[in-house]
């Protein structure tokens, strides 16, 4: 049996519901009951930190939109060295380094900022692309690239979810004040329809809650 808790409050301020859900996760862990905490939208870095700080564990998190990919794990696993090699960077490109990030300058004027994960020691959570001081793109990593977010004036306008080979499996596209969703060749116009597709992919049994 697996117990699924759906988080519908990612975009809201911290509240008592968050604490109660984390307490329940701890209780289920102590009872050795398999449980998943489902993110129904991709959380921003500070939100992910918040939920992890409450006691949730990476291996218990389930990202609904990543289910449309063939990714095996969303847990940060790549080191600075591994990504430095991937981006063909050298020590000469390194401009600054601390416990929280490493900044590289590319020949085309782009600055890459490797943000370290606070809960997976030595691993990079995401890479930010800055041009002329502006954030243009953010790539999230597990064992491979998971998600790419595109920014315009600091606002996310597109989010792509990748298969292990880098191909796009699912996308969120901002259209004015609303969002459209691309799943393969289909365009879905409501989040409700997206969640229906997600639930259809879950390996649910009659014992699950």
Model-inferred region functions:
Residues 85-195:
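Repetitive, compositionally biased segments used for assembly/scaffolding
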Residues 1-84, 164-209:
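Long terminal segments
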């Amino acid at each position: 049996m697996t117990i699924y808790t759906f988080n519908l409050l990612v975009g809201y301020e911290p509240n008592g519901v968050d604490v109660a859900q984390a307490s329940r996760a701890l209780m289920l862990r102590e009872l050795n009951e398999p449980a998943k905490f489902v993110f129904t939208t991709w959380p921003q870095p500070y939100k992910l930190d918040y939920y992890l700080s409450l006691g949730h564990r990476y291996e218990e998190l389930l990202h609904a939109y990543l289910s449309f990919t063939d990714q095996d794990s969303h847990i940060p696993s790549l080191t600075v060295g591994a990504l430095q090699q991937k981006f063909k960077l050298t020590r000469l490109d390194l401009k600054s380094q601390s416990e929280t990030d490493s900044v590289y300058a590319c020949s085309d004027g782009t600055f890459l900022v490797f943000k370290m994960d606070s809960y997976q020691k030595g691993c990079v959570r995401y890479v930010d692309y800055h041009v002329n001081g502006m954030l243009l793109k953010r790539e999230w990593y597990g064992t491979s690239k998971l998600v790419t977010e595109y920014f315009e004036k600091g606002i996310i306008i597109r989010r792509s979810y990748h298969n292990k080979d880098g191909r796009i499996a699912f996308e969120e596209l901002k259209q004015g004040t609303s969002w459209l969703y691309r799943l393969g060749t289909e365009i879905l116009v409501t989040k409700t329809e997206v969640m229906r597709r997600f639930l259809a992919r879950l390996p649910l049994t009659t014992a699950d809650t």
